[in-house]
Swiss-Prot record:
Residues annotated as transmembrane: none
Function: May be involved in the regulation of genes for 4-hydroxybenzoyl-CoA reductase.
Superkingdom classification of source: Bacteria
UniProt domain HTH marR-type: residue ranges: 1-155
Name listed for the protein in its UniProt record: Putative transcriptional regulatory protein for hcr operon
Claim: Acyltransferase is one of the keywords in the record: no
MF (Gene Ontology): DNA binding; DNA-binding transcription factor activity
Keywords: DNA-binding, Transcription, Transcription regulation
Organism of derivation: Thauera aromatica
Length: 166
């Protein structure tokens, strides 16, 4: 059996049928996420070296000074054991510092560094432009409606922390 290398010919894709999943919301949510992340990678990751996940974590740390690593893991819906790797990356980039809690030596508190604050401000501007470009085919009202509907869906998930706010 020959392994497929590269992209298939456009003629192969012209006849592609997705079957019943073409009517499933989850399928379209995933396709939308892939498209958004692909554009983020082209515009933000290539220039700033930050993935959507790292950007999200920087936002949460910046808006919650002293947040513990465990709380960050819950807020980002990431396994606590894998959060250490990501925090290490952010610390190695000089964007955050990890301090031992004065009340519990087993707990680490996360804070932005001055260079991290500057980098986040620059990245936020780029993300705002990227987000506007990505949603350019939607009116402001449609964009607001879509965000509202998506929030309603993920807030019904029993594993989404109730105290996570925008």
């Amino acid at each position: 059996m020959r392994k497929h290398r590269g992209k298939p010919a456009n003629s192969d894709l012209a006849e592609l049928v997705h079957g019943s999943m073409a009517g499933e919301l989850g399928f379209h949510l995933r396709r939308g996420q892939i498209a958004a992340f692909r554009q983020f990678a082209r515009t933000i990751t290539t220039t700033e070296g930050v993935t959507p996940g790292l950007y999200g974590m920087l936002q949460v740390i910046a808006n919650n000074p002293g947040l513990s690593q465990s709380a960050l893991a819950v807020a980002m819906d990431v396994d606590r054991s894998s959060i250490v790797k990501v925090v290490n990356q952010l610390e190695e980039k000089g964007l955050i510092v990890r301090d031992t809690s004065p009340t519990d030596r087993r707990r680490y508190c996360l804070h932005m560094t001055p260079p991290g604050v500057q980098a986040l401000a620059r990245i936020e501007q780029a993300v705002m432009r990227q987000d506007q470009d990505f949603s350019a085919r939607l009116s402001d009202a449609e964009r607001g409606t879509l965000i509202g509907l998506l929030k309603r869906l993920y807030r019904q998930d029993s594993e989404t922390p109730a105290n996570v706010r925008e």
